[in-house]
Amino acid sequence: MKTLSTEEIAKSYGGRQVVKGVNLQIEQGEVVGLLGPNGAGKTTSFYMIVGLVRPDSGRVLASGHDISNLPMYLRARSYGISYLPQEPSVFRKLTVQDNILAVLEAQQLSWEARRTRTERLIEQLNLGHVRKTRGYALSGGERRRVEIARCLAIEPAFILLDEPFSGIDPIAVLDLQEIIFGLKRSGIGVLITDHNVRETLSVTDRAYIITEGKIFATGTPGELGRNPDVRRIYLGENFSMD
């Protein structure tokens, strides 16, 4: 079982420590949330796991291997860590099919293997009806599915999702949640950071709550929802998953 974890990662900006020794772990086949108030350090922690930010101290580990100093492309190539940014990442002037093929050009695959994998991803993400549609003409939900298909093109062990529920309508949210459940069933580990708390907790097996740069609490969605301290500092007293 592959794992993605951190050991005491820390980060300071301008003399202010924003992450203070964060420890977390994700295994293949589980969905984990990384949540917390604005300014709590969750985004910086997430970016250190992704490879966008280098920790000042501590380590990011892929199945025990220190990847703290590896760039994103080597984390993807060597350890199967894929990243979906919050910002739109599709090529606007390419069709859905060509968007997926473009990612596969970097893989050591024959043309036929690339075409076969593209067809499988189009079917898996229910994109057949828009395969010839260019990126700029996609809806928010369709664009998200194309972006996830591109993440899956490298056959990752882990997918890191940055604000995946941002900017899409309620129907697309439900669609995306089903896709995340499908990723879990296929044995992919998923780490989500998002401001949409209910949508995120609805798909997670467990979550970490960060505040003031430290892990404040961890548990299942039910455990966190019943935790009076978590409700006080983050969820609010009237929080409900209903």
Model-derived features: positions:
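The feature captures the beta-strand-to-loop junction immediately N-terminal to the Walker
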Residues: 35-37
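Conserved catalytic motifs of ABC-family nucleotide-binding domains
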Residues: 155
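Conserved ABC ATPase signature
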Residues: 134-138, 142
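Conserved ABC ATPase "signature" region
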Residues: 112-130, 178-181
